[in-house]
Amino acid sequence: MGTLPWLLAFFILGLQAWDTPTIVSRKEWGARPLACRALLTLPVAYIITDQLPGMQCQQQSVCSQMLRGLQSHSVYTIGWCDVAYNFLVGDDGRVYEGVGWNIQGLHTQGYNNISLGIAFFGNKIGSSPSPAALSAAEGLISYAIQKGHLSPRYIQPLLLKEETCLDPQHPVMPRKVCPNIIKRSAWEARETHCPKMNLPAKYVIIIHTAGTSCTVSTDCQTVVRNIQSFHMDTRNFCDIGYHFLVGQDGGVYEGVGWHIQGSHTYGFNDIALGIAFIGYFVEKPPNAAALEAAQDLIQCAVVEGYLTPNYLLMGHSDVVNILSPGQALYNIISTWPHFKH
C-alpha cells in the first residue's frame, strides 16, 4: 500500500501556529481512571500517526461515546491499561486526551517509550481526515514542540500501516529491532565465568522471580543484584539464573545475556532463553510496559540470530512443577506467538 497523502502532512506544514490547542480532557469525554504508569522521557523524538476506522462521529458527544467504547475494548478485551494513544484527533476538529503527555502509549511496540502516538478517528471509512482534524493535529504538534514534549527535529517514521489493519481489534505492532538493555555493569554484577549457550536457542521460557517487584530503575537494579547474590551464594549457581530480567519500569536487565547458559530450568539451560519478570504474578499480571519489553526482547532475539525463528515459547510451569511464572502471567503468555503448552 502507498503512503496515505495526509500522512506526509506534518513533514511539509510550517508549524507556525503556537496557539494552545483545544484539548477535550479525559474527564470531559468520560474516561475511566488512568491505570498506566510507565512514564515518557521528554522531549520524545518521534511521532506515530494512526487512523482508526469504524468510529465515525462529527460531534463531541458522539466522539466521546466512541472513545469510551474504545477504552473499554482496550482495557477489558485486549488487556491494556488504557487506550493506546497519547492523543486522538476527531473528525470534528477536536483533540481528545488519551494517556496524555507524560505516559507511554501502547500504539507501536518498539516506539512507545520514545514517541507520541496520535490517532485520527471519526471520518468515513476510505476517506482522509477532515481539514479541521489535520489543522487540530498541526496545532497539537506545534504546542508539543513549544512546551518541550516533542523535539523540534522530530521524526515521523513511515511504518506503512494498512488502514484495514488499524481496527483496534487487530492492531498492527511494528517493532524496532531491540529494546534498550540495561547492562550488567549498570547493576554492578559480579564477574563470573560460566558455560556457553548453544545458539541459536530453540525455546523461550517465561519465569517470575517470585520476590519483590520494582517500578523504578534504581530499585530494579538493586533487586537484580540481590538475586545474583542469592543465586550464587545460597543456591551455588555460577551466576544469576536468568538470561534477562524485566522490571515493571519497562526495563530489560541483562542477566547472563545471550551467550551464557542460564540456571533456570534443568534440561533446557543450554538451549532456552530464560526471561524472568521481576515480581510475583499469581493473581495480578505484570504491567503493560513490562509485557511489551519482554515481547520486544523476544523479537530482538530472533532478528539478531540468538533465537531460531521457529522457536517454542513456554511457561516455567510447563517444564517444571512450580508456580512460576504465576497464573496471571501464564494466562497472558499463552496468547503470545509460538506458545506451546
Curated annotation (Swiss-Prot):
Residues 1-17 form the signal peptide. SMART domains: Ami_2, PGRP. Pfam families: Amidase_2. Its main location: secreted. Disulfide bonds join C178-C300, C194-C238, C214-C220. GO terms for cellular component: extracellular region; membrane; protein-containing complex. Glycans are attached at N113. Detected in skin epidermis, eccrine sweat glands and ducts, ciliary body epithelial cells of the eye, in small intestine, colon, stomach and in mature epithelial cells of the tongue (at protein level). Highly expressed in skin and esophagus, expressed also in tonsils and thymus and to a much lesser extent in the stomach, descending colon, rectum and brain. The keyword Signal applies. N-glycosylated. GO terms for molecular function: N-acetylmuramoyl-L-alanine amidase activity; peptidoglycan binding; peptidoglycan immune receptor activity; protein heterodimerization activity; zinc ion binding. Peptidoglycan binds at H231, R235, Y242. The keyword Metal-binding does not apply. GO terms for biological process: antimicrobial humoral immune response mediated by antimicrobial peptide; biological process involved in interaction with host; defense response to bacterium; defense response to Gram-positive bacterium; detection of bacterium; immune response; innate immune response; killing of cells of another organism. Residues 77-179, 200-325 form the N-acetylmuramoyl-L-alanine amidase domain. Induction: Up-regulated by exposure to Gram-positive and Gram-negative bacteria. It is found in: Secreted. It comes from the Eukaryota. Residues 264-269 are annotated as: Interaction with murein. Keywords: Antibiotic, Antimicrobial, Disulfide bond, Glycoprotein, Immunity, Innate immunity, Repeat, Secreted, Signal. Monomer. Homodimer; disulfide-linked. Heterodimer with PGLYRP4; disulfide-linked. Pattern receptor that binds to murein peptidoglycans (PGN) of Gram-positive bacteria. Has bactericidal activity towards Gram-positive bacteria. May kill Gram-positive bacteria by interfering with peptidoglycan biosynthesis. Also binds to Gram-negative bacteria, and has bacteriostatic activity towards Gram-negative bacteria. Plays a role in innate immunity. Belongs to the N-acetylmuramoyl-L-alanine amidase 2 family. This is Peptidoglycan recognition protein 3. It comes from Homo sapiens (Human).
